[in-house]
Amino acid sequence: MSTYPKTAALMKRGTDFLGCETAILCGAMSWVSERNLVAAISNAGGFGVIACGAMTPELLDTEIAATKALTTKPFGVNLITMHPALFDLIAVCRKHGVTHVVLAGGIPPKGSVEAIKADESGIKVICFAPTLALAKKLLRSGADALVIEGMEAGGHIGPVSTSVLAQEILPELAGEHLIFVAGGIGRGEAIASYLEMGAAGVQLGTRFACATESIAHPDFKKAFFRASAREAVASVQVDPRLPVIPVRALKNTGTEEFTAKQREVAALLDAGEVDMGEAQLQIEHFWAGALRRAVIEGDVENGSVMAGQSVGMVTKEEPAADIIAELMSQCEAALAR
C-alpha cells in the first residue's frame, strides 16, 4: 500500500506511462541534468531526464551509458528540435533502449517522431505544448504525452502563465491524453491542484537544481538560496526581427551582456553578414556558454543562472529523495483536507 494513497491514485496514469513510482519528472537543465542528478531522481522514484542540449551524439552516447551504470530505473532524454544532429541523437537513444524521448524547443521537424518510433521501438515521445491548438496538433502528429510549461519556469519560456495554460488545456485534453504541468511548481500543494484538474503528473526543474547530487557549482547553488522569486527575470527582446525565445534567469551582469549580444547580432543582420538562421544560432551559443560559466565554473555574475520563479522556495541543499518525499507528503496532505 502506498504511503501517499490519494496522490498515487491521481498520478496512476502518469506513473504507468513513465514506469516509475511518482509522476514527477525532473525538467531537463543543460549542464545540471546529467548522469548524477538523473540517476538520483530515478532511484528516488521520480523520472530523471538527461538534458542533451548542445551535446554531440558521441557525448550523449557516453552520458546515457554512464547514467545506466548508476540506475536500473527508467529515465528519459530531452532533445532540442533545432539541434543540427537531431536524427543522429535519436539513433543514439534507440541504440541504448531509452524508454522516453522529450522533444523541446519547437515543433518536431518532419520525420523526427517517426524516426523515434520506427520498427516498433516502443519509445514514448513527450512534447512541449505552449497553446491548446499546438497541443492538439502534436497529439495528432504522434506525441504520446505533453508537458505544458508556463512562463514561471526557468530557462527558455513562453508568454503564458502555468495556471492559465492549465485552465485552457487540462479540461479540453486531460480526459483522454496524458498532460504533465510545469513552471513555477515548488510545493506539493500546487501539485495537488493540477492533479485534481486532471494532470497525469508534473515537471519541476528549479526545485532539483540544488539537490545534493546536482553537480552545479557551490556558488551557483548559493545564488539560488539567496534569490527571491522577483529576481528570476525574463530576458528582453531588443530587436523584433530576432526570433529570440525569452529566457528566465537570475538578474546579473550576464543579463545585460545578453542585451548587448542581441544588438551585436542585429548589426550583423543589418550588414548582411549573417542570415536569420545563423543569427539564431549565435544567440543559442551565447546561452550555452553563459550557462556553462554559471553552472560548472561558478561565475554567477557573468554567467547565466537560469532559474524559475519557484527559486525563492529553494533554501538548502538536500538529497533528491528528500525533495520528492517532501513534495509527495505536501501533496497528500492537501488532497486529504
Model-inferred region functions:
Residues S2-L178:
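Active-site entrance/lid segments in N-terminal catalytic domains of soluble metabolic enzymes
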Residues V32, I185-G186:
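Residue-level detector of alpha-helix initiation sites
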Residues M151-E152, G183-I185:
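Acidic, glycine-rich active-site loops and adjacent beta-strand->loop/helix elements
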Residues P159-L178, G186-R337:
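Conserved active-site-proximal phosphate/metal-binding subdomains
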